[in-house]
């Protein structure tokens, strides 16, 4: 993500479990990113509801005997809180599929995986990434003016 615009700066890479094995894919992620660097800001996860990814990656790394993948122990940006605030503080209805053009949630992904409908999984991941980036860019373009407006209300 571009720190200036929130837009993508590279191409989407989908690590496909059906082309390899989970342990190999997770190892590739650890090797090809700066996630394990000692410097906390080398890899900053940005997403929506990162708790889901955190729990999954942490548990699967443990199962495979890989280094700890704890995406919430270093700096991260989770836009879920913005969705909750935009829904008036309500968690219900604040999913990415409820506040963007994302057509559905990920409930069908395990089913598609089980029956080998991998094209639908790729389409889903691409749609989710596209809608996340669109939302992120929109927020980046509007939040600076909110900060200026907020500063004008300071009494000190």
Feature names for model-found ranges:
Residues 1-36:
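Conserved RNase H-like, two-metal-ion catalytic cores of nucleic-acid enzymes
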Residues 6-11, 39-156:
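Metal-dependent phosphoesterase core characteristic of DEDDh/y 3'-5' exonuclease domains
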């Amino acid at each position: 993500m571009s720190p200036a615009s929130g837009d993508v700066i590279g191409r989407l890479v989908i690590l496909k479990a059906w082309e390899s094995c989970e342990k190999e894919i997770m190892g590739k992620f650890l090797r090809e990113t700066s996630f394990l660097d000692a410097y906390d800001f080398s890899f900053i996860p940005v997403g929506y509801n990162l708790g889901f990814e955190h729990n999954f990656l942490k548990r699967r790394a443990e199962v495979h005997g890989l280094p700890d993948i704890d995406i919430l122990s270093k700096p991260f940006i989770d836009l879920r809180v913005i969705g909750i605030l935009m829904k008036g503080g309500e968690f219900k209805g604040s999913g990415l599929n409820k506040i963007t053009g994302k057509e559905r949630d990920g409930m069908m992904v395990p089913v598609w995986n089980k029956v080998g409908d991998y094209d639908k999984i790729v389409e889903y991941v691409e749609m989710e990434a596209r809608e996340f980036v669109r939302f992120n860019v929109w927020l980046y373009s509007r939040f600076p003016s909110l900060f200026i407006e907020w500063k004008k209300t300071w009494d000190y």
